Amino acid sequence: MADQGEKKENPMRELRIRKLCLNICVGESGDRLTRAAKVLEQLTGQTPVFSKARYTVRSFGIRRNEKIAVHCTVRGAKAEEILEKGLKVREYELRKNNFSDSGNFGFGIQEHIDLGIKYDPSIGIYGLDFYVVLGRPGFSIADKKRKRGRIGFKHRIRKREAMRWFQQKYDGVILPGK
């Protein structure tokens, strides 16, 4: 029989990484964008997807539906491994405003070669954005097409919980917001 003094944690309340989204926005189509796609492919081992501009911005020289960015979604153990590399570059320090109210967080790095990818002069150096979506067991009911459910208010992830999870799991430091 279990100890009465020791309270067990509910396994359904435990936080985990649902997905890690990596994004490189070049701001133009062409050779630089294909080189950025190579960087993401080297990092994740998956084929990245190109993002199109929503509307024309003449001052930036961007036309509507022009491919301007490349992104990739990683899940599972590979997501945790890549996130660990990214946080190591940031020295496990995030700001309070890096966390959203729904318990997700994101950050960026200046140079992809800090992640351990060998520098290739033909590719160059790119910065990239990391965005982490956290979840709990049972969150998939909100994603179903048939018999879709809603996540109850008590089961949702809040900003404080995500910050506490980051501090405990990665021994991270949360700096005050700007």
From Swiss-Prot:
Keywords: Cytoplasm, Nucleus, Ribonucleoprotein, Ribosomal protein, RNA-binding, rRNA-binding. The keyword Ribonucleoprotein applies. GO terms for molecular function: rRNA binding; structural constituent of ribosome. Its main location: nucleus. It is found in: Nucleus; Cytoplasm. SUPFAM superfamilies: RL5-like (SSF55282). GO terms for cellular component: cytoplasm; nucleolus; ribonucleoprotein complex; ribosome. The keyword Cytoplasm applies. Component of the large ribosomal subunit. Belongs to the universal ribosomal protein uL5 family. Component of the ribosome, a large ribonucleoprotein complex responsible for the synthesis of proteins in the cell. The small ribosomal subunit (SSU) binds messenger RNAs (mRNAs) and translates the encoded message by selecting cognate aminoacyl-transfer RNA (tRNA) molecules. The large subunit (LSU) contains the ribosomal catalytic site termed the peptidyl transferase center (PTC), which catalyzes the formation of peptide bonds, thereby polymerizing the amino acids delivered by tRNAs into a polypeptide chain. This is Large ribosomal subunit protein uL5. It comes from Ictalurus punctatus (Channel catfish).
